[in-house]
Amino acid sequence: MTKYIFVTGGVVSSIGKGIVAASLGRLLKNRGLKVTIQKFDPYINIDPGTMSPYQHGEVYVTDDGAETDLDLGHYERFIDINLNKYSNVTTGKIYSEVLRKERKGEYLGATVQVIPHITDALKEKIKRAASTTDSDVIITEVGGTVGDIESLPFLEALRQMKADVGSENVMYIHTTLLPYLKAAGEMKTKPTQHSVKELRGLGIQPNMLVIRTEEPVEQGIKNKLAQFCDVNSEAVIESRDVEHLYQIPLNLQAQSMDQIVCDHLKLNAPQADMTEWSAMVDKVMNLRKTTKIALVGKYVELPDAYLSVVEALKHSGYANDTAIDLKWVNANDVTVDNAADLLGDADGIIVPGGFGQRGTEGKIQAIRYARENDVPMLGICLGMQLTCVEFARHVLNMEGANSFELEPSTKYPIIDIMRDQIDIEDMGGTLRLGLYPCKLKPGSKAAMAYNNQEVVQRRHRHRYEFNNKFRPEFEAAGFVFSGVSPDNRLVEIVELKEKKFFVAAQYHPELQSRPNRPEELYTAFVTAAIKNSN
């Protein structure tokens, strides 16, 4: 029988529910249990694919092409699993499916209501996420805060699950903030008490509290919370601020969180062996070198827009015993005249993805600086496309060369819309999304990065591709197409072989990086940057 764990949040948003859920998932996985995890997002968008990065942060893409919340990146990196489209559910997605069924007459004339139709659809998503992965345990995080009007149908579905599958198969974990008033010198439990009271008013009694705090929590405070919130005192778990996120699973294990969960759900599983994880954390805490990487992006005011990129750089740094000193460079600020001032102290330059015209000329100048000064450079998605545009303009002398996306009237559309995208008008969910194969050119830097594999599978999110009619001119000038689709139609990786490292990929390699298994192309880039710093 599958066990269901539901993680809710109270008092304030952005309290770290996703990290708690991911950390618990890692602990349960290391007990030998098969774990999956999902995120419920109460917003009305179908998915975050068309949302501004300033609103939502990065869009995380799964193997099967779902555009999802960035928390799924935390889940995959912590638990080291590949999630699917059932792992992110929004209000918009649920209502869209229910209304589509109503239009088809599938409800046989019934009045369609929040209860039972919306709540039934939500419960079906929970069960489908578990069944499609054959999991022993599924962890479901509900976004937002208890008390938000948008969350009510989600919480009602969670309440009903207890009756549907039995109380011994369900556990409710509530994460809250325990504020510390410096002037008074004391922690305040009242916000947590009120949050739990509101949750109980919706029919959910939490079995565990995870309290986010900046200061150590005395046992007396835990006992008080246990008494007023009706949970066992040992089930009041402290989640203190840490230097590195990957410390959190170890901190939670030290408080027997996973054992309490297993006892409640009657899961007979051995103790979690966290030896490898602990060694990784110890290494992360004691890195001996530092390498400066300049990230040239459009959305640098909100680092969450590049969360997976940053994590992938860190992972590759760990593998090289190196801390990454990230220099955020706004692409709008980069010009041919100041590129050296902005980028001259960087050991490597990364140009990540994005959409739209703004900042693209700055990215092109950053790429030009890297090429002309032989600074290791990694381009991702739009960064790959602009790498091709930069080469066309400044090496092949194609004045005005551009991407058709950015300038439809350009004489040299180096990047063009994919053939199967021409007649598509909707923006959401219509990109080339998910896992696709990439055939590597033997002897190339890309092939060497991937240990001379013939084919790698990587995740994509794009609508435009390199225009193949320009391939002969590029190749004649030494531009290497080192990764292509198996049918040779789509360009996946480009590089300049004579440079220290000048490689750009159409796909998003960062989405498959893990703290104990860094993505190979990122590792090759970071390794080249380290050599460049010596």
Curated annotation (Swiss-Prot):
Pfam families: CTP_synth_N, GATase. GO terms for molecular function: ATP binding; CTP synthase activity; glutaminase activity; identical protein binding; metal ion binding. The active site is at residues 381, 508, 510. Residues 1-267 are annotated as: Amidoligase domain. It catalyses: UTP + L-glutamine + ATP + H2O = CTP + L-glutamate + ADP + phosphate + 2 H(+); L-glutamine + H2O = L-glutamate + NH4(+); UTP + NH4(+) + ATP = CTP + ADP + phosphate + 2 H(+). GO terms for biological process: 'de novo' CTP biosynthetic process; pyrimidine nucleobase biosynthetic process. Residues 292-534 form the Glutamine amidotransferase type-1 domain. PROSITE patterns: GATASE_TYPE_1. ATP binds at residues 14-19, 71, 240-242. L-glutamine binds at residues 54, 354, 382-385, 405, 463. CTP binds at residues 13, 148-150, 188-193, 224. GO terms for cellular component: cytosol. Keywords: ATP-binding, Glutamine amidotransferase, Ligase, Magnesium, Metal-binding, Nucleotide-binding, Pyrimidine biosynthesis. Mg(2+) binds at residues 71, 141. Its EC number is 6.3.4.2. Homotetramer. Catalyzes the ATP-dependent amination of UTP to CTP with either L-glutamine or ammonia as the source of nitrogen. Regulates intracellular CTP levels through interactions with the four ribonucleotide triphosphates. Belongs to the CTP synthase family. CTPSs have evolved a hybrid strategy for distinguishing between UTP and CTP. The overlapping regions of the product feedback inhibitory and substrate sites recognize a common feature in both compounds, the triphosphate moiety. To differentiate isosteric substrate and product pyrimidine rings, an additional pocket far from the expected kinase/ligase catalytic site, specifically recognizes the cytosine and ribose portions of the product inhibitor. This is CTP synthase. It comes from Streptococcus pyogenes serotype M1.
